[in-house]
Curated annotation (Swiss-Prot):
The lineage of its organism: Bacteria, Pseudomonadati, Pseudomonadota, Alphaproteobacteria, Hyphomicrobiales. ATPase subunit of a proteasome-like degradation complex; this subunit has chaperone activity. The binding of ATP and its subsequent hydrolysis by HslU are essential for unfolding of protein substrates subsequently hydrolyzed by HslV. HslU recognizes the N-terminal part of its protein substrates and unfolds these before they are guided to HslV for hydrolysis. This is ATP-dependent protease ATPase subunit HslU. GO terms for biological process: protein unfolding; proteolysis involved in protein catabolic process. Its main location: cytoplasm.
Length: 435
């Protein structure tokens, strides 16, 4: 769980997302409140419910990007799901309780990594012994082992190939639900793995280099030192208290006025979401999980429908409303130049792999922003995503010929931008299909 203050969270989001200060503030406060709640007296802690958020704004203004960056910052179980992927209980498809089961799986992964880090030093010692066993055998004299140990630590044997035995992770195939027992998920071909574990675990032989073997061996030895029951218990607790669910495209399940057919199913998904958002208990293969304190952040463009088209009960469970504003020319300029992984920086780095030095003048950046704004206003407003389309069009020739132009420098100015997309941007009929 992150201990960042709201101001630190906002400044971290500012590195990747331009503008939308209100939305950043809302998620920063919500994230900080998770930490504040943990500091309370247990009797009061259960009474403090998360204030769920509804983000409203056109496509391409940063709703999904805020969720992606928040996931990395949170240090807590976090899952982003599309509301349109789920169907009403009784219909073919995934039911909404699967969201919580997937969230627990994320929690299991986080806790397991944390536990592995705690025992890494001890696991490294055991891994080194196993590498030595593979190199000199188990019957070698102590002097021989020490001689090889010194070479191993000096990196002299890094490229030598050895055979090691590591735990077999199974087929990795999906599973199926046991009828009448939601959450009781059985792997299709993992029954043999279950029996294998009961008889001491299955292993497989792998041929690899000494250096590469450490990753598998340290993971193997770490897993022997950690208790799976403790991991499951901690993951369920972490999911219940710190879990965050980001529900994207919530506007697509809003029933429109006079809607028939699909609208009924959409309303069914909303009704199924209600208990989840308010607080219920979901059965998972790791035990029951309470959703009372899981934070839900919903987002949608609401082009066709409006937030008031959602079920009144669901609206009431999303008390914090944040509106994200459309992007203007200055925002596009800043997106191209100021963000940590800006498009211009990405394209420069890509061209540097071909020994091509790519430079953009200030007026070129202005021209790119102008074209993006014009297309968004005349064709369809897709926000910052328009910049990727325009940039690809401008750099098409350079990307194609880059291998033949290694060692040269290319400067892109406003004239170059206009030459490659200017005419097309002015012709609205054409740009509908090409940009």
């Amino acid at each position: 769980m992150t201990t960042f203050s709201p101001r630190e969270i906002v400044s971290e989001l500012d590195r990747y997302i331009i503008g939308q200060h209100d939305a950043k503030r809302a998620v920063a406060i919500a994230l900080r409140n998770r930490w504040r709640r943990q500091q309370l007296d247990p009797s009061l802690r259960d009474e403090v419910m998360p204030k769920n958020i509804l983000m409203i704004g056109p496509t391409g203004v940063g709703k999904t990007e805020i969720s992606r960056r928040l996931a990395k910052l949170a240090g807590a179980p976090f899952i982003k799901v599309e509301a349109t992927k789920f169907t009403e209980v009784g219909y073919v498809g995934r039911d909404v309780e699967q969201i919580i089961r997937d969230l627990v799986e994320v929690g299991i992964g986080l806790v397991r990594e944390k536990k592995r880090t705690e025992v890494q030093a001890k696991a490294h010692v055991s891994a080194e012994e196993r590498v030595l066993d593979a190199l000199v055998g188990t019957t070698a004299s102590p002097a021989t082992r020490e001689s090889f140990r010194k070479k191993l630590r000096d990196g002299e044997l890094d490229d030598k190939e050895i055979d090691i035995e590591v735990a077999d992770a199974g087929s990795g195939m999906g599973g199926f639900e046991i009828p009448g027992m939601p959450g009781a998920n059985i792997g299709v071909l993992n029954l043999s793995e279950m029996f294998g574990k009961a008889m001491g675990g299955r292993t497989k032989k792998v041929r690899t280099t000494v250096k590469a073997s450490y990753t598998d061996l340290i993971r193997d030895e770490s897993d022997k030192l950690i208790d799976n029951e403790v991991i499951q218990r901690e993951a369920v607790r972490s999911t219940e208290n710190d879990g965050i669910v980001f529900l994207d495209e919530i506007d697509k399940i809003a029933a429109r006025d006079g809607g028939m057919g699909a609208g009924v199913s959409r309303e069914g998904v909303q009704r199924d979401l209600l208990p989840l958002v308010e607080g219920t208990t979901v059965s998972t293969k790791y035990g029951p999980v309470k959703t009372d304190h899981i934070l839900f952040i919903a987002s949608g463009a609401f082009h066709v429908s409006k937030p008031s088209d959602l079920l009144p009960e669901l609206q009431g469970r999303l008390p914090i409303r944040v509106e994200l504003r459309p992007l203007n020319k200055e925002d596009f300029r800043r997106i191209l130049t100021e963000t940590e992984a800006s498009l211009i920086r990405q394209y420069r780095a890509l061209m540097e792999t071909e020994s091509l030095n790519l430079e953009f003048t200030d007026d070129a950046i202005d021209a790119l922003a102008d074209v993006a704004v014009h297309l968004n206003s005349s064709v369809e407003n897709i926000g910052a995503r328009r910049l990727q389309t325009v940039m690809e069009r401008v750099l098409d020739d350079i990307s194609y010929n880059a291998p033949d132009r290694g060692g040269t420098a290319v400067t892109i100015d406003a004239a170059y931008v206009r030459e490659h997309v200017g005419d097309l941007a002015q012709n609205t009929d054409l740009s509908r299909f090409i940009l």
